Amino acid sequence: GRIISLAHPVAMGGCFLATLYAGYTGLQWRMLRELGVELKEARAAASAAQKAVQEHAGAGASDEEALAPPPPSLVQAASDADAVVASLTEKRSVIQAGNFRDRHYQLGTILLAVGIPMALEGPVNTYMRAGKLFPGPHVYAGVGVASLWAIAAALVPEMQKGKEWARTAHIGVNAVTFGLFAYYQIPTGLEIAAKVIEKTKFP
């Protein structure tokens, strides 16, 4: 029936949207980690700037010189460093509030639990209806998408160990997945869905 036949395109359309949002949440999570590194460096720079101001204030040969204010350049440098720390802290807090790490994990779980079974359901349903498969870009790209989802998930343990190569590979794999989805799966899938609607009846 039409409902069963359209289950695959509807589910895979949802998976495409989930892939887009997973990419967004993943990049936000990566940005959060990078901000943590930047914030650590900025705090060290701010501490060094404040120390320079304090050392200059106490470096005079006499009490009168010691009480002299530090040069404006040192004060400005310390102020600028503090401003950078404040800006990065605020930016990090905003991203943390988005809870992107957990969202990214949840979307990945959905793609594995729904996307891969539905990717298999498509050709199975076609074979049950037509008695044969129709090899072409849609089928080949679908196999590629499902395989790349599995590869991306397989990289997670190494990513959790802090391996940068795994993180880079994870991003690259998912970028290819998006390309296959957008360039092959969506256009060819819409054509197939139109034929299914034309040749089937409810339910």
Which residues are covered by each model-predicted region?
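Membrane-embedded alpha-helical bundles that constitute the cytochrome b-like, heme-associated redox core
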Residues: 1-203
